[in-house]
């Protein structure tokens, strides 16, 4: 870089750190005049030139310190500029580095933005999950409050339950009693219906005391037509009921035997208790008089009331049938 400054009679140049000072045109050399006849003019010119040189020297002497100060300032500025240039070079290098760094940072920023997008989506999902969880918590809280309320009511409910249980026990007992009473009423109704048809009831059986005498076989056929048989006797109480109801009249009962010397049996297939039956025969009976007394009847008004007789004789008769509950 070259800087030129003008002075009245000097030329000043700064080239890097080299400084030169010279007049624009070298002074004319002294010597004999080349042009004859012009000596005064030349002399005058020389004088003027001398004066100019003297003035230049004086001016240089006066201005030189100032110029030197300026040069010093210029050097300082040059050094500053050089430092700045170096700084600019360093700065350029840093800029390049920073540019590369910025590119890398741009990539990183893009990656960070992508990560932020992912994080944002995850955050939204998490937010949704938290909202759902909060809703569930509210539901659970309400449920817990309801449970707490119910827990507070448990003692009262337990007391009510115990009362209800006791009441249910009573109700079941009453229902049982009601069912039993209903069955009893139904049984009584069934009995009354049969009794209204001329039958008598005793300990689970119906007995029909006929008004018309028949032979033993005809009497049995009549009983069968009424869903019954000639009566059997299985206990002392039944024997007592029969002879008392008979009132001293003779009634065929279901006693019969097979053959001349056969064993006695009940026509309704009730097992015949020979040992027990001994107490129910009239003393001396059965005697099978005439060898044809194969059927039995009630003759005497006492426990010992049975008598054997011919089956073709006609007597009143007693039919017997068990009580069977009617359909609901």
Swiss-Prot record:
Q: What cellular-component terms does GO give this entry?
A: clathrin-coated endocytic vesicle membrane; early endosome membrane; endocytic vesicle; external side of plasma membrane; plasma membrane
Tissue expression from the record: Exclusively expressed by Langerhans cells. Expressed in astrocytoma and malignant ependymoma, but not in normal brain tissues.
What is the topology of this protein in the membrane according to its UniProt annotation?
A: Single-pass type II membrane protein
Kindly list the biological process annotations in GO that this record carries: defense response to virus; immune response
Q: Quick check: keyword Amino-acid biosynthesis in the entry?
A: no
Key words of the record? Coiled coil, Disulfide bond, Glycoprotein, Lectin, Membrane, Signal-anchor, Transmembrane, Transmembrane helix
Outcome of substituting residue 287 to A: Loss of binding to 6'-sulfo-LacNAc and invertase
Q: What is this protein called?
A: C-type lectin domain family 4 member K
């Amino acid at each position: 870089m070259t800087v030129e400054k003008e002075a009245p009679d000097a030329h000043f140049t700064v080239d890097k750190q080299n400084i030169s000072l010279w007049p624009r045109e070298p002074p004319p050399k002294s010597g004999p005049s080349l042009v004859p006849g012009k000596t005064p003019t030349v002399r005058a010119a020389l004088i003027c030139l001398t004066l100019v040189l003297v003035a230049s020297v004086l001016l240089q002497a006066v201005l030189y310190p100032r110029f030197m100060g300026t040069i010093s300032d210029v050097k300082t500025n040059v050094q500053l500029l050089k430092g700045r240039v170096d700084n600019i070079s360093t700065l350029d290098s840093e800029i390049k580095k920073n540019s590369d760094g910025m590119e890398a940072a741009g990539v990183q920023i893009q990656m960070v933005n992508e990560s932020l997008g992912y994080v944002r989506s995850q955050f939204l999902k998490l937010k949704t999950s938290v909202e759902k969880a909060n809703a569930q918590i509210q539901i659970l809280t309400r449920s817990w409050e309801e449970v707490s309320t119910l827990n507070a009511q448990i003692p009262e409910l337990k007391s009510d339950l115990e009362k209800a249980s006791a009441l249910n026990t009573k109700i079941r007992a009453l229902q049982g009693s009601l069912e039993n009473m209903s069955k009893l009423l139904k049984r009584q109704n069934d009995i009354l219906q049969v009794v209204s048809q001329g039958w008598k009831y005793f300990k689970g059986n119906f007995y029909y005391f006929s008004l018309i005498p028949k032979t033993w076989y005809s009497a049995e056929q009549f009983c069968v037509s009424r869903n019954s048989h000639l009566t059997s006797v299985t206990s002392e109480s039944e024997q007592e009921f029969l002879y008392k109801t008979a009132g001293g009249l003779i009634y065929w009962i279901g006693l019969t035997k097979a053959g001349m010397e056969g064993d006695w049996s009940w026509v309704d297939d009730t097992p015949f208790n020979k040992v027990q039956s001994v107490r129910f025969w009239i003393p001396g009976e059965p005697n099978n008089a005439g060898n044809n007394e194969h059927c039995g009847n009630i003759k005497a008004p006492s426990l010992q009331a049975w008598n054997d007789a011919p089956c073709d004789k006609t007597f009143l008769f007693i039919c017997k049938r068990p009580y069977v509950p009617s359909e609901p």
